[in-house]
Amino acid sequence: MAELPHRIIKETQRLLAEPVPGIKAEPDESNARYFHVVIAGESKDSPFEGGTFKRELLLAEEYPMAAPKVRFMTKIYHPNVDKLERISLDILKDKWSPALQIRTVLLSIQALLNAPNPDDPLANDVVEQWKTNEAQAIETARAWTRLYAMNSI
């Protein structure tokens, strides 16, 4: 494996030394470009409150010129996450900038988790329900959180 760029080493050291509240991110023992991430649903009144959501984050060889790849590993009912657990977040697509860091990506995912954006959907069936019957969509999201995200502590 190629030597890790200094930037990735520094970002990883900072993540481990100064963890973001509600987020745990650790590099894999065998691949320092692959991170095991757990983000807690902490926002009051969020349907994801109390859940712990696992993700995987992969830094491509081109990082930071290319955005990290992020996928949910915990099933979630969210308009910005599709059935393949891919996430729709502008900074992971057309708004990516090499000035952004892993920490920024994780904070943005945490914010999106707590405040879904139906105007940038990835899961059309979920966003349809979110727009036509938000109360039912929120209840479904709470049920999925209880079912899939509260069983691992």
From Swiss-Prot:
SUPFAM superfamilies registered for this protein in UniProt: UBC-like
Record keyword Cell cycle present: no
SMART domains for the chain: UBCc
One Pfam entry name: UQ_con
Keywords attached to this entry: Acetylation
Gene3D superfamilies tied to this protein: Ubiquitin Conjugating Enzyme
GO BP annotation list: protein polyubiquitination
GO CC, alphabetical: extracellular exosome; nucleus
Record flagged with keyword Acetylation: yes
Domain UBC core span(s) in chain numbering: 3-150
Database matches in InterPro entries: Ub_conjugating_enzyme, UBQ-conjugat_E2_core, UBQ-conjugating_enzyme/RWD
Tissue: Expressed in epididymis (at protein level).
Any one GO MF annotation of this record: ubiquitin conjugating enzyme activity
Residue list for modification N6-acetyllysine: K83
Family stated for the protein in its record: Belongs to the ubiquitin-conjugating enzyme family.
Protein name: Putative ubiquitin-conjugating enzyme E2 N-like
Source species: Homo sapiens (Human)
Encoding gene (name): UBE2NL
